[in-house]
């Protein structure tokens, strides 16, 4: 797993460097304009406008190559052997790489200030674009790094044969909830659409799967329920799971009565008796799946399992839920970074574009 995480981080480093090349090219164009007297000699006899057009085209191609590559820089996938603290460590490392990207963007702004007047219109515009991008990257970095300690040395979806469930640690749940809520806010502030929860209940295609919620019991489930739990998780998307979690509140309590359509993912994660969890089929599947994902990823959390080795099916449901949630979070981060970098590039391109006479 460490080798896989290292490979992912290396790919992210390559992506960051490609983006910095793009931005450096933009600043480099500024320097070419400043040195008009020697421009033709420095460009092999071509006109300055020809050089600018060629460099601009290269910058555009490199930028979109970066955006294509960034789609492959994440992609941590949980297996039955993945430990909870490995997921937390991955998020922490990803946050560190966003911090490095922010530092590199700062160098772009400094370069523009050195090569031109610090208070000149081009340098000021580049500084503003970089600072805006850095603010979002810094926000994402902080919340991703806060997830470092949410797990422990148990496997994701931890369950044991014929054992009752255990609710996750409150501090871990609250930290995870706050981080996810803040990441979603940063995304929407950057122009990304917020995830939406669906209305699917625990009855799917005429099949009642309410017993699958018993994997979140704090007592023994009383029957093999792992497969029904997987059916619940499979009925919803990662986006719906994420939306159900961020709609929760820290103060949402464990179930002291029967679950219904208003029961949140946080309450499901904290659990209740098997009877309260499975009393009706009206709860939202996304909320149950969100509860399974939270309990599967956060320290101390344990899913309830029946005997006859049914813990394998229970853990499988936890792994599916965790992967769906992680994919949704990763997708949101990619979209956010993409929007932020595109906006920064647009502003920098506009700042270095030749001005018509009278607009200098």
Swiss-Prot record:
It is a lipid-anchor. Keywords: Cell outer membrane, Lipoprotein, Membrane, Palmitate, Plasmid, Signal. The Vlp and Vsp proteins are antigenically distinct proteins, only one vlp or vsp gene is transcriptionally active at any one time. Switching between these genes is a mechanism of host immune response evasion. It comes from Borrelia hermsii. Belongs to the variable large protein (Vlp) family. Alpha subfamily. The keyword Lipoprotein applies. The gene is vlp18. It is found in: Cell outer membrane. It holds the Pfam family Lipoprotein_2. A lipid is attached at residue 27 (N-palmitoyl cysteine). One of its GO terms (cellular component) is cell outer membrane. A lipid is attached at residue 27 (S-diacylglycerol cysteine). Genes for both Vlp and Vsp families are on (usually) unnamed linear plasmids in B.hermsii HS1. Residues 1-26 form the signal peptide. Its main location: membrane. The keyword Lipoprotein applies. This is Variable large protein 18. InterPro entries: Borrelia_lipo.
């Amino acid at each position: 797993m460490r080798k896989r995480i290292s490979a992912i981080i290396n790919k992210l480093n390559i992506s960051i460097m490609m983006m910095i090349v793009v931005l450096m090219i933009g600043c480099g164009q500024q320097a070419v304009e400043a040195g008009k007297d020697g421009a033709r000699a420095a460009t092999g006899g071509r006109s300055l406008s020809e050089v600018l057009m060629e460099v601009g085209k290269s910058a555009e191609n490199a930028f979109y190559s970066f955006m294509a590559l960034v789609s492959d820089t994440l992609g941590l996938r949980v297996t039955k052997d993945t430990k909870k603290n490995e997921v937390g460590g991955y998020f922490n490392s990803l946050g560190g790489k966003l911090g490095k990207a922010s530092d590199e963007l700062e160098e772009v702004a400094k370069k523009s200030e050195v090569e031109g007047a610090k208070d000149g219109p081009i340098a000021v515009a580049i500084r503003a674009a970089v600072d805006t991008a850095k603010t979002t990257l810094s926000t994402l970095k902080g919340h991703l790094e806060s997830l470092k300690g949410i797990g422990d040395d148990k496997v994701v979806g931890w369950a044991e044969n014929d054992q009752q469930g255990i609710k996750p640690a409150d501090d871990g749940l609250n930290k995870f909830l706050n981080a996810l809520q803040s990441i979603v806010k940063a995304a929407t502030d950057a122009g990304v659409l917020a995830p939406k929860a669906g209305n699917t209940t625990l009855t799917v295609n005429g099949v009642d799967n309410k017993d699958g919620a018993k994997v979140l019991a704090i007592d023994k489930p009383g029957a093999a329920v792992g497969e029904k739990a997987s059916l619940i998780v499979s009925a919803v998307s990662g986006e719906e799971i994420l939306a159900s979690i961020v709609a929760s509140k820290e103060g949402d309590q464990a179930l002291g009565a029967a679950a219904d359509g208003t029961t949140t993912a946080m309450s499901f994660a904290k659990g209740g008796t098997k009877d309260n969890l499975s009393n009706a089929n009206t709860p939202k599947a996304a909320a149950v799946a969100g509860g399974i994902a939270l309990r599967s990823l956060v320290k101390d959390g344990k899913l309830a399992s029946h005997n006859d080795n049914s813990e394998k099916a229970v853990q499988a449901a936890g792994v599916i839920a965790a992967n769906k949630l992680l994919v949704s979070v990763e997708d949101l981060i990619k979209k956010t970074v993409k929007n932020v970098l595109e906006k920064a590039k647009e502003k920098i391109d506009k700042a270095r574009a030749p001005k018509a006479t009278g607009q200098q």
